Amino acid sequence: MKHFARGVTHDSRFFEPTPIYCVKAKGSRKWDVDSNEYIDFWMGHGALILGHANPAVTKAVVEQARKGTHYGASHELEIEWAEKVKHLVPCARNGLVEFTSSGTEATMMALRIARVYMGKTKVVKFISHFHGWLDYTIVDYNPAFSPPLTGSFPSGVPEETCRTMVALPPNDVESVEKTLEQGDIAAVILEPGGASMGYLPTSKSFLQELRRITRKTGVVLIFDEVVTGFRDTPGGAQEHYGVTPDISTLGKILGGGYPGGAVAGKKELMEMLDIKKEEGWDARRISHPGTFNANPISAAAGNVCLGLIKEGKVHPKVNRVGKEFKSALNDVLQDNNINGLAWETTPSIVFIGFGFSEEDLQVVDIDSYVKFQKKKDQSQKVVKRLEKAMINKGVHLMSGRFILSVAHDKTDIQATAEKFGLSLKELEAEGTLKEFT
């Protein structure tokens, strides 16, 4: 607490009694300041699909660092990086790419592009869907649904800003249709895999309906693929579900484990960033500075990572391991007669919850969302205790998430499943699981 207000530099890293401070990481493992070794399922908050300190990425970064870390000029690596994005991401194939320094910045850019292009201010988002920490997208409350929805607008954000965002229940087609018919919406943004990295899944049919409705009303459809981009498939969730948005935001895997983000999409939208000698254009166009946009280090790492993905060297393994891991966790739950569930919307991010059924994950309106949220709140009390038990056994999960990489293997899966079982027995003995057995 001497240097940071909460002892950490990211809310999700806050942990009681003390957070984990690491000194090194390699492959699927990391080590803390006390030399404790962990099987890591944070994987850089989802950025490290190749695992820690991947040799090919590290080599490229070291070589580039020797050449220079920042030219203050354009460079060939950024062109190669953009070419790979356009090759892999469906909505970018006949469009343009704009690099940023993070996924949050990419979201800021995408919203501004949509608002300028449409000449409108309001944006639809979905409750519990995460889009970074900017003022607009942290709005997760809509008084129109209160009750049964509880909450308020976020602290520190002016109410007039909050009112430009229309937060709707996840997967609620009827609410979307009614809202867009009013004619004052610039864009709809969502995590296509589902809320909070897919914790609350989105269905293919909902995405198809969303595409139909936005196309009918002329509203810009934005997929936040900061998590799902290059993870669900080489082309992300839009390739996986076969639904192409107008714009996509990217981050995490994009930079190969280094800072980076991007907006990619239709040319007519991305041209809002163009510089033209047209009368009045300067007053309309979007200016985009950014000291570290497409910096050579991130571009070097991103090029290697996307290159391996493009060559098909990532997804066959990481998806297979993810499916095996989910099955292993469910087997442990069943063997211990515990009312719990392991699930995924992308095979390489597996969630664990208690008191959930597959039916509980089918949220389609405010009532089913509130029901889901109540079960989630109860489940998270157990998950927090589970996380501590597993950390003590050398497994670091991310608040009920297991994020996998190509570095995870059968040894990691078997060891984690075994330690998961031991942790459940520990929780059962102390009474933490009494409501779920």
For the regions a protein language model found, what residue spans apply to each?
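Conserved N-terminal phosphate-binding loop of PLP-dependent enzymes in the Aspartate aminotransferase
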Residues: M1-T437
